[in-house]
């Protein structure tokens, strides 16, 4: 009813339910609207809302706040990790001090508002360092996800990337991170997480995992060859008009592709003279 003529919304104030009438008033709605749903379908803000609002994408207003955005991944994951969970209920400055310590800075115990044993401090530092690695991967995934979602299908040279680098992903990985992990175990944890995420996509699990490996610079020689094959086939099908278009469109696309190939051969011959 918030989007229609009623302009009403149900809420809770001081433990009691009430209805808020927002007719004639300006208000702000914050919502998580990903370009794609978890199944890989395009997400659309309902017209009843989009036609009556100024819509701002986080990516459009993030400039200059990248560090704060990156830190928000750590802050939102605190309660998901057994070692870091106590920090969620303590002075926020304790987290900032622990983050600085995990980055290699010298932090005096007097800067902490709560008492931490040496073992607890060491475990928190180790887990935070692991989460920095996870966070950096998720930020790359998120950037590619947004870039791919904003690209028109007509200009794609490779399949769309639909794996997400969200707070939800961060929390799911963070709950399995322990201080004793080594670098390889951490990379394997990320691999396993995204292997499971890829299975929720309606199509394209393989191609998305290969793109992820490329982003992480972890493509094997065989995977690199397979990824190149998939991209070449994607471009070939697109040049032919796609898999679902009518025969005339496909024929036109094929002839257009032949023309482009002949032009490339002509240019190569002229360049060799």
Task: Label the predicted regions.
Residues 1-273:
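C-terminal regulatory/interaction module of P-loop NTP-utilizing enzymes
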